[in-house]
């Protein structure tokens, strides 16, 4: 009040000095000079205070509060003077308008200078408050003070509504002051020291340790249970300037990624260090995963992630109106975490069979994890859709996984040896099969083919209870793909053996026929392209079997190529040796085919091979132009060897009559031993038994070779028409 008395005296002198209440120009100028003098003295004291603090750095115990009070008093006095000048003095003293306007400008300049001084004083006051808050370790107050300092120094209007932010003119003059750079440096020092102090305190409350060994690593996380202190520090630390990259990198590299990628042993305790900390220890191998690497079970991965979030839950406080600590951490780790989780954990955990699919809770578990991450503010459910999209694509993942697993198993079966065989349909003999076309004949197939059929049976037995009426069967088409794979791959994988080993080709033929029969039996199971598939299977098996039959025929023909007559009078030993060699070749083939092929297929095949051999033998005989009696006898004996041994190649010897040239061979033997009359009788004027196998020219040729040129021969030849 004592300081306010002179102010009112000056005003009273200025506006009532003439005794009649009229304003006096000289009195007003005198009052302004007095105020200016007081302001100059005040600014000199403020300047010295600022220089001591921010230029000379001298000891100074003066409180800025004293200067702020005086500055406020001068501000109010000048504003009152300006108001009175505007409402009373200027209206009454028209003759002094110019001088009074100049006085007004002078007062406003004084007021601007006071504003700058007050701005600097308030900054100084905030610095002193910072020191006091540091002494009490009140970090939230410290953070607020540092924010207000920034508002005063840099003109940030959004930091604090209570901060008396200066006008643009005051800011401009303030930034031109010599002390401005020093004030900025001091502010940055205080901000850095606050950040370091908060980080050190945070590191004591949240302890992250990683110990590495030659082949393993142990990671320990300890979080203080003092929630009040912990959240105060976290709220102060996790402000906008703070960069949590180091913390996020540690969590991602040492905790999140290993938990997803490797088997991890987790040890959780809520009573660490005498109950003052929550502790989570993670131990895992660091050796690079090999081909035999076993992925951790997805349930264990999700449980370990929950433990990690639960351990760190104490730091997940709100740092602003719309942001939490886990949200800040999530911005740094969520993209890689979600990608690893889906690609390396969840997709490999998708079931590979419908039995597993029926009991799997993978979708429910993923949905629960997603909700946990949303509730923890790590992910935004509208933007971070990786887990939701996994659930949406679950059926596709399942179908692809099942297809891939089935085809991998099918390919593994295809690689197995065809020679490892097993008897099927042991009681379905040819007679029963002939009467019932739906029966598969008794034969041998590869054990791998039997396993292949078991795999297809297992696929067809897969329950589809979870599929809706409109949903496609997840196994649709896989049978067709498997069988086409078998058809295409077996000839490639076993090419050399199929070409060189007769039994391999026969087994592949039987396998294809067995698959054809299986497809026909399951015609009502929705197998894609059923008819075309059955035809392809049948044609493929027959094609490779035909190649082997033709090869065996070529062997017989190769032997018969050396069949030559040493002379016209005697047969010699060569032809008999070659005939026996052909029969021996057929007997060897019988040993590998008789119990493997279905009986009807075996009989038809051997009839064809024997016919090839017999037809060539007959052709060779008919190349002779002259056959002596001795030669005819020896040829008869040669043919008799064939007639005796060929029937033994069949399970039922009578099957030999199905050989096309068999009757012709028998009749040839008969003609070699017959007289001229007997031959003509067998011809019987073109209606005898010989006409079933021979043409007239063949009979004439044989008569000319067997008999000398006589009238009887000529007469007989004339009867052969």
Curated annotation (Swiss-Prot):
Subunit text: Component of the RZZ complex composed of rod, Zw10 and Zwilch.
The entry's keywords: Cell cycle, Cell division, Centromere, Chromosome, Cytoplasm, Cytoskeleton, Golgi apparatus, Kinetochore, Meiosis, Mitosis, Nucleus
Keyword Nucleus carried by entry: yes
Main location group: cytoplasm
Cited function: Essential component of the mitotic checkpoint, which prevents cells from prematurely exiting mitosis. Required for the assembly of the dynein-dynactin, Mad2 complexes and spindly/CG15415 onto kinetochores. During cytokinesis in male meiotic cells it is required for completion of cleavage furrow ingression, possibly in conjunction with Rint1. Required for maintenance of Golgi stack number and morphology, and acroblast assembly. Its function related to the spindle assembly machinery is proposed to depend on its association in the RZZ complex.
GO terms assigned for molecular function: small GTPase binding
Pfam families associated with the record: ZW10_C, ZW10_C2, Zw10_middle, Zw10_N
UniProt record, GO biological process: cleavage furrow ingression; endoplasmic reticulum to Golgi vesicle-mediated transport; Golgi organization; Golgi vesicle transport; male meiosis chromosome segregation; male meiosis cytokinesis; membrane addition at site of cytokinesis; mitotic sister chromatid segregation
Protein name: Centromere/kinetochore protein zw10
Cellular component, GO annotation: acroblast; Dsl1/NZR complex; endoplasmic reticulum; Golgi stack; kinetochore; kinetochore microtubule; nucleus; RZZ complex
Subcellular location(s) per record: Cytoplasm; Nucleus; Chromosome, Centromere, Kinetochore; Cytoplasm, Cytoskeleton
InterPro entries, sorted: Zw10/DSL1_C_sf, ZW10_C, ZW10_C_2, Zw10_middle, Zw10_N
Disruption-associated phenotype: In the spermatocytes the number of Golgi structures are reduced and they appear smaller or have collapsed Golgi stacks. In third instar larvae spermatocytes, cytokinesis is abnormal producing multinucleated spermatids with a single large Nebenkern. Acroblasts do not form and instead appear as an aggregate of multiple unfused vesicles. During anaphase and early-telophase the central spindle appears regular and acto-myosin contractile rings form normally but during mid-telophase the rings fail to constrict.
Stored Gene3D superfamilies: 1.10.357.150
Keyword field contains Nucleotide-binding: no
Family of this protein: Belongs to the ZW10 family.
